[in-house]
Amino acid sequence: MTVEFCKYLSQKTGHEYRLPTEAEWEYACRAGTTTPFHFGETMTSDLANYDGRYLYGSEPKGIYREKTNSVGTFQVANAFGLFDMHGNVWEWCLDHWHENYDNAPNNGDEWLDSSENQTRIMRGGSLLNDPSMCRSSSRFHQKASETFKHVGFRIVFSL
């Protein structure tokens, strides 16, 4: 559905829109940082929407909101001005799922299989996850044909 939406939007506007590659997503999330989260070493439920009943590091337990929030609810943008890169909803990436990065493109291009692999990468974690699943480096996968209330997407505009 997400790839089809990007194709539709591209045809409608005459500009190329697509899902980000996994490498692009992580670059956008980190925004030049090297910490687990773009806002630092740890996370609290004051900074993102995740299952706050789980601890991360030395932080106390937080709130479990049980629903998605509107974009920008926490008003914690990264250095690129992007909101909600951690938690709220998993975000689809263009790449197919691979267990590791062996033989992955080293230039940021998408990594697609020639097989029937329809399992795609998701990044960012969601409201249902503990904080460790919301780190900049965390990754998950699902069949692209499946839909969930805790999965969304953000699109890339190609220049």
Which residue stretches match the model-derived regions?
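Short, structured beta-strand segments at or near domain termini in extracellular proteins/domains
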Residues: 149-159
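Functional-site microenvironments in short loops/helix caps that host divalent-cation chemistry
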Residues: 1-138, 147
